[in-house]
Amino acid sequence: MATLATKKATLVAALKDLQRVTVAFSGGIDSTLVLKMALDVLGRDNVTAVVANSELFTDEEFDKAMSLAEELGANVQGTTLDYLSDDHIKNNTPDSWYYAKKMFYSRLNDIAANNGSAAVLDGMIKNDENDYRPGLKARSEAGARSLLQEADFFKTDVRALAQELGLTNWNKVASCSVSSRFPYGTTLTHDNIAQVMAAEKYLRSLGFPTVRVRFHNDIARIELPEARIGDFLVFNDRVNRQLQSLGFRYVTLDLGGFRSGRMNDTLTKAQLATFA
């Protein structure tokens, strides 16, 4: 297996070949490492960071990503995407994330064409080759590059190099689109999205940074890391009251704990194979 130094060298060589790039930037550790390395290798004038603002991510996440890109010294621009204008996304179909990523990559390609970039870069890593990843198909169709994935970076590699480079978010908890909180086939609205976002914000304020509130109409199913379930029990009453005030009739705690991609358990083998 290649060492971290070897993987870093592969990443540097790939960046040098591209000369000028546009980076899809979310503020997460993966895209932060891509942006930092691009800036170090190519210089500020040859790198543009793009942050998407949409209904599926919080305003707080957008603002933090914009600020972080600026702190890193990047030329950064925000772009607004109306994901709910696409019926596949609005109806949360099993392939909805393909259409969401397709919309984003299309916007990124337009921006890259305008600034003369040789490529659009994202933060996908080797771990992203597993599970159900419709975003991989959208990326391939758009011609975007995942240099971390190409250089065999796993999450442990990303965190190690990010820490080595002094990136403040090297151990940041991963986040993802709020659509992942809804069962496939659930119609996404501004109201139920806001309901879930408010519930998760409240739970994070209690000291649970890794949390998911899965939406099942009038039922909120809370997922936490199994090691934190015991800590959570002292907050039962206040959490129940707060989430009921947000519109949930029943508030439940999933004893199976947190697991990313949980909603994909309902997909058939044929559906999973669509984007394999």
UniProtKB/Swiss-Prot annotation:
The keyword Nucleotide-binding applies. Changing C176A: Loss of activity. The keyword Magnesium does not apply. Changing D30A: Loss of activity. GO terms for molecular function: ATP binding; lyase activity; sulfurtransferase activity. InterPro entries: LarE (IPR005232), NAD/GMP_synthase (IPR022310), Ni-pincer_cofactor_biosynth (IPR052188), Rossmann-like_a/b/a_fold (IPR014729). Its EC number is 4.4.1.37. The active site is at C176 (nucleophile and sulfur donor). Coiled coil: none annotated. The modification 2,3-didehydroalanine (Cys) is found at C176. It comes from the Bacteria. It is an enzyme of class 4 (lyase). Involved in the biosynthesis of a nickel-pincer cofactor ((SCS)Ni(II) pincer complex). Catalyzes the ATP-dependent incorporation of two sulfur atoms in pyridinium-3,5-biscarboxylic acid mononucleotide (P2CMN) to yield pyridinium-3,5-bisthiocarboxylic acid mononucleotide (P2TMN). The source of sulfur is the enzyme itself: Cys-176 of LarE is the sulfur donor, thereby being converted into dehydroalanine, and is not regenerated in vivo. Thus, two molecules of LarE undergo sacrificial sulfur transfer to create one P2TMN. Binds nickel. Is required for the activation of the lactate racemase LarA. Belongs to the LarE family. This is Pyridinium-3,5-bisthiocarboxylic acid mononucleotide synthase. The gene is larE.
